[in-house]
Amino acid sequence: MYYGERFNSISHLIGAVAALAGLVVVVVIAAQQGDPWKIVSFSIYGTTLFLLYTISTLYHSLRGRAKQIFRKLDHLSIYLLIAGTYTPFTLVTLRGVWGWWLFGVIWGLAVVGMALEALPQKGNRILSVLVYILMGWLVLVALKPLLEALPFAGFIGLLLGGLFYTGGIVFYLFDEQVRHFHGIWHLFVLAGSVSHYLTILLYVA
């Protein structure tokens, strides 16, 4: 394993461990409150977060055929995490018509995105990124009800996380041309995850 891949695997191994601990924390908080919506939504969110970092760690640690399989799983897990991150905001913060509408649309897009990702054709990277961006910023259609339901500091945390993820895409797109760009992408992903997790912990839980 060359240095870049070592960094990629270790950085997301740290993310996986943190995600598992974070999952336990938010689910315990939800259980103590006895809120089934929080228990379900936090479980979905935390599980998708843990899956993404675990799969990414394995992808960057393996070689040969196994690496190719986990590369595909790595891409699929991105759709799951985006939809999983929306889940607490839609089922707990918004709920109602806006919450359920956004919940249905975002998970529908996740299914469509994963279906496209599973196709054997190559060269779908740009299309995948466009779907990531569409899913990530779809929340803006519910901006007004979200601002009414979420404290402003929570909205800033949500926005900041989105900016980290989106800003990192530049490094993701050119990671095959420039060495270590993929590692920088990983740092942006970690920053986005931390921002969104803290927002959920402090303003949704």
Predicted feature descriptions by range:
Residues 1-205:
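Multi-pass alpha-helical transmembrane bundles in non-GPCR membrane proteins
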